[in-house]
Amino acid sequence: MRLSEFHLHTTKEIPADAELVSHRLMLRAGMIRKLASGLYTWSPLGLRVLRKVEAIVRDEMNRAGAVEMLLPTIQPRELWEESERWEKFGNQLLKIKDRKQAEYCYSPTAEEAVTDYVRQELTSYKQLPVNLYQIQTKFRDEIRPRFGVMRAREFVMKDAYSFHLNDADLVREYENMRATYTRIFTRLGLEFRAVQADSGAIGGDASQEFHVIADSGEDVLAFSTGSDYAANIEAAIAATPGPRLTANETLQKVSTPTQKRCEDVAALLDIPLQRVVKSIAVMTDSGFFLALLRGDHTLNDIKLSKLPGLANFRLANEVEIARHLGSEPGFLGPVCPGMPIRIIADCEVAVMADFVVGANEVGFHLVGVNWGRDLPEPEVVADIRNVIEGDRAVDGGKICIARGIEVGHVFQLGRKYAEAMKATVLDEYGKAVTMTMGCYGIGVSRIVAAAIEQNHDVAGIIWPASIAPWQVAVCVINPKKDPVITAAAEVLLAELQSADVDTVLDDRGLRPGVMFADMELIGIPHRIVVSERGLAAGTYEYRARHTAMVENLDKTTLLMRIKA
């Protein structure tokens, strides 16, 4: 490949609304250009990277036994009504009409279409299991598309769907796909974590997300130093606390005139924040509760909502708080003589002794509070908090917190769609059995942006070798000055290509500084400079993108370095 024959247009100008590094660098490198809100054209350079990601995904899916297919992006309303998602999916579903006024949607996902295909094609248990996948354009009508291709309305996705006779076989394929995703992201050269996740509205018995670690990630992850345990922050758990501490203090009421925040109370009393207990008033279908957390912890809404009777909980308002406790936020507490309060204590709070709580009196807190003496044992003890950095993990390691960008997700869907769409096969006894499903998605175009978020510097992109547009750039200095220089570069290009090294020849005749800046910006892993001075010395200038070291190497050493 010669850059003189390739459309490469880099720029220093970027729109003011380009917030993420990946968005800015993709625009500067000329990988994408905005067509409309949330819609991007992939340039020849950008497409080279996208295709390399697709190739790795396709190779590993095929290796895992999945079979590629292609479903229409435009799908009829009737299918989505069968699954009851025509209305439930919300405004992200782009609905359109043809000239006959028949209604369709632009597919954001393909559970309905693939289930329709399978129910027509499969009739016997002998045809199961099957795992079908596609790499296809999707569309979700995001209300506020932003961050370039990271959250575009149109995107490229690999979505796979497996169909099984029973749950045991679904679990087997789910584990197969988890292992496949691990191989995919390893080959992509990305630092990632597979995390336990909440299944959310899509349902299912098991759900795991794959996140690329990056400071700009929207999701907060917790992972252990002791094993491969990792989870989304809403699903992460810490080790069970030890036995309850011994009580040593007597109950006292102290003045805290303006101290409403736990941090301020701890500072006033000159005690660790971990000794203060915060009381969060919540209303549920069964009434008023106080949820108790340690002062340095935060409430995990999802964990709390999963407790019996708390699915629809909400925070109590000031009127409700005053009616039940006769106080106001900032001074609430569970010690209420003669006024029993239903208490949900986090596991950490349940083993505390000599702790501090609000006195249910404005301007006062209670110190030296102990279970069983000053207040009854909690009605419910449960893990209702978010883990924090340094918590003891369930495997004995320490919890670390990082941010991640979700690029893959695997679900055990179960029979949700198959039941709704009557997708059955006959079992070995001739009885109709509803198939059970798994679904496995990878955001192909999002991976490109996530890779940049994780791998860049002030000069530009630092691609992992497996997805760089080219492995090597051969830069020719003054190609028109001396045909010998160009000839030497052509020979080197041919040698690298014959060794299956994806190489581009920069023969545009630009100033060296401009050429080098472009190669750094677009992230080519290896740069070789062919110059009159170097040829006279029998060497080529070499630099790896991830270092600042420039070396002058003879051809044999150079080729060995590139192929290593």
UniProtKB/Swiss-Prot annotation:
It catalyses: tRNA(Pro) + L-proline + ATP = L-prolyl-tRNA(Pro) + AMP + diphosphate. PROSITE patterns: AA_TRNA_LIGASE_II (PS50862). Its EC number is 6.1.1.15. Catalyzes the attachment of proline to tRNA(Pro) in a two-step reaction: proline is first activated by ATP to form Pro-AMP and then transferred to the acceptor end of tRNA(Pro). As ProRS can inadvertently accommodate and process non-cognate amino acids such as alanine and cysteine, to avoid such errors it has two additional distinct editing activities against alanine. One activity is designated as 'pretransfer' editing and involves the tRNA(Pro)-independent hydrolysis of activated Ala-AMP. Consists of three domains: the N-terminal catalytic domain, the editing domain and the C-terminal anticodon-binding domain. The keyword Acyltransferase does not apply. This is Proline--tRNA ligase. Keywords: Aminoacyl-tRNA synthetase, ATP-binding, Cytoplasm, Ligase, Nucleotide-binding, Protein biosynthesis. Gene3D superfamilies: Anticodon-binding domain, Bira Bifunctional Protein, Domain 2, YbaK/aminoacyl-tRNA synthetase-associated domain.
